[in-house]
Amino acid sequence: MTGYQQAILMLLGVDTCGKFLVRCVDRWYIDAVSELFPSAPYLQRRADGKKDFWVLKSARVHLLQSLADVTDWQGFCRCVVELQACLDLWPHKVRGKPTRTPRLRVYGQPELLTHVSSHFPAGPKKLQFRRTQTGETCVLYYQSPAEVTDILDSLHGEPCNRELWARWDALMQQNKPAG
């Protein structure tokens, strides 16, 4: 099992009533772990106006992961960032002049973020607690363009969600100075 698969199982998997299931609106992540399950993925259609999601389920598979089980930190961190981070252009002022630079926000539980951030080529960041509609979460902000570039460069590899990385690469290109 790869670190990438371990992250999917840890972040999207749940053990319920003797069955282990993984669900996600993006089929890519379900397909990335489908080889670990004896059953085929299916689309769970929702009638309540919410998004449909893909599901893998098995009573014979119990793959709940812990951080101590991680074997491939680069793949694990890549998947955590894909699933729980937001990359955007942060509007702010430099010397009174408006500008927009890349900002990477990584969300999650404190223990997860502490372990993941220790594998980033960036200085230590303070965990910030944020209240959400479903409770409380933590976030790490990376707002230095150099740090964001270094982190994303260090995470490039396979497997990865190519659609997501194409969007992120395009966003990072918007920030490059002309020349």
Write out the residue ranges for each language-model feature.
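Internal intein/HINT superfamily modules and their associated LAGLIDADG
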Residues: 1-179
